[in-house]
């Protein structure tokens, strides 16, 4: 597979805190990669660096062979990087379909084309009954689906998911993991931050682990579950994979 994203010695310092400290990894096109670690490990800061929300103190970010270190969020979106947030941030003055149309307009010339694309995505994501509904009627689970739909409507090459399982019921988690697992089939590469570990451990083939700003492990889920360094740092005991 072709390399899509390279992170090279990426560092971000806030005062005396090294929130991200010399992180290196490569993501290939079509990968579905988990990123785990406790609160404060540096995951959100890493996302902010990749998405252009903040500039690194040192290091480089390369997307599709082009260095994009320090780019602006709108440049990231145009280049095909999308992200979601743990707490969904829809446009509450717009209905469900128009929230997705806003994203779809990035790559469609007319509102009609964008609306058709948005409707197709919402149908695929189980939101066909809510196209014209106001945001206020959506449950947490449906809001999370909308958040993913908005990201997919940007036609991203890479999407950064941030705890999309938070607040979901076990049934909703199973359904959402199916949606996430389907995205590489749409040509979308995924990095997925998650604290609902059973969801991520049973869905991805590769997991990266951050601790105190550093990447301490990068391996298959079954190996991560038995890695003594990971167990000691986060879990205190061996993690079940199934």
Named regions from a protein language model:
Residues 2-242:
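Glycine-rich phosphate-binding loops of nucleotide-dependent enzymes
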């Amino acid at each position: 597979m072709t390399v899509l994203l390279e992170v090279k010695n990426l560092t971000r310092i806030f005062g005396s805190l090294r929130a991200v400290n010399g992180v290196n990894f490569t993501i290939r096109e079509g990968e579905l990669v988990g990123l785990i670690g406790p609160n404060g490990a540096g995951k959100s800061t890493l996302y902010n660096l990749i998405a252009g929300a903040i500039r690194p103190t040192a290091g480089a970010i390369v997307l599709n062979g082009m260095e994009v270190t320090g780019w602006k969020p709108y440049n990231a979106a145009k280049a095909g990087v999308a992200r979601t947030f743990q707490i969904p941030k829809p446009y509450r003055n717009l209905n469900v379909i128009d929230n997705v149309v806003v994203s779809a307009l990035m790559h469609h010339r007319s509102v009609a084309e964008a609306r058709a694309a948005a409707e197709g995505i919402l149908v695929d994501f189980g939101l066909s009954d809510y196209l014209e509904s106001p945001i206020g009627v959506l449950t947490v689970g449906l809001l999370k689906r909308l958040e993913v739909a908005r990201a997919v409507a940007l036609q991203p090459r890479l999407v950064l998911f941030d705890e999309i399982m938070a607040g979901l019921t076990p049934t909703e988690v199973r359904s959402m993991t199916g949606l996430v697992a389907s995205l590489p089939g749409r040509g979308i590469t995924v990095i997925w931050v998650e604290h609902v570990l059973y969801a991520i451990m049973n869905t991805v083939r590769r997991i990266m682990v951050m601790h105190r700003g550093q990447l301490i492990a990068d391996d298959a889920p079954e190996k991560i579950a038995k890695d003594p360094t990971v167990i000691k740092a986060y879990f205190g005991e061996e993690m079940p994979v199934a």
